[in-house]
């Protein structure tokens, strides 16, 4: 599948590699922090970081997800401020990453550092059918631990 990409920061593809799949089994493309200089992200602080690129999916059967990189979250407490970024197929603006330091220590984010992943996913747009009752199931309305822990 082809997705249109507009490079907004010329350092992408010159100083830093363009997003690519690291292995044949990789699901995500790494997104980089397009910064002019390193920034300090204090514990509890949330900042919005430019990626230097815009992606236009065009096909309404797909959407993009911006997801955290596992190492940053586990080792440094750096996760996405909105937990998951949803990029609709008709969005054409620059991809931005909301970064939240949920850790205990100040984190230094360097220019060009890999910060998040972009994953393309299929989308099914549902049509709601209003009903008075649902067909009964064994589970019913049970949730939030209803099926047990083991």
From Swiss-Prot:
UniProt keyword terms in alphabetical order: Hydrolase, Magnesium, Metal-binding, Nucleotide metabolism
Annotated SUPFAM superfamilies: dUTPase-like (SSF51283)
Enzyme class: hydrolase
Catalytic activity: dUTP + H2O = dUMP + diphosphate + H(+)
Pathway info: Pyrimidine metabolism; dUMP biosynthesis; dUMP from dCTP (dUTP route): step 2/2
Keyword Hydrolase: yes
Alphabetized GO MF terms: dUTP diphosphatase activity; magnesium ion binding
Coiled-coil blocks: none
InterPro entries for this protein: dUTPase, dUTPase-like, dUTPase-like_sf, dUTPase_trimeric
Binding site for substrate: 69-71, 82, 86-88, 96
Co-factor requirement: Mg(2+)
E.C. designation(s): 3.6.1.23
UniProt-listed GO biological process terms: dUMP biosynthetic process; dUTP catabolic process
Keyword Manganese appears in the UniProt entry: no
Family from the record: Belongs to the dUTPase family.
Function recorded in the entry: This enzyme is involved in nucleotide metabolism: it produces dUMP, the immediate precursor of thymidine nucleotides and it decreases the intracellular concentration of dUTP so that uracil cannot be incorporated into DNA.
PANTHER family (alphabetical): DEOXYURIDINE 5'-TRIPHOSPHATE NUCLEOTIDOHYDROLASE (PTHR11241:SF0)
NCBIfam families per the UniProt record, alphabetical: dut (TIGR00576), PRK00601.1 (NF001862)
Name of protein: Deoxyuridine 5'-triphosphate nucleotidohydrolase
């Amino acid at each position: 599948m082809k997705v249109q990409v507009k490079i907004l920061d010329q350092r992408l593809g010159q100083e830093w590699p363009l997003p690519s799949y690291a292995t044949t089994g990789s699901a995500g493309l790494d997104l980089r922090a397009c910064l002019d200089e390193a920034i300090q992200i204090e514990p509890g602080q949330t900042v919005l970081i430019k990626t230097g690129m815009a992606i236009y999916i065009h096909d309404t059967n797909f959407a993009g997800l911006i997801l955290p990189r596992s190492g940053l979250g586990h080792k440094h407490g750096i996760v996405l401020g909105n937990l998951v970024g949803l990029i609709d197929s008709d969005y054409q603006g620059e991809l931005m990453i909301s970064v939240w330091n949920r850790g205990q220590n100040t984190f230094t984010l360097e220019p060009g550092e890999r910060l998040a992943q972009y994953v393309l996913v299929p989308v099914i747009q549902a049509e709601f059918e209003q009903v008075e009752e649902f067909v009964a199931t064994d589970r019913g309305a049970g949730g939030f631990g209803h099926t047990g822990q083991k």
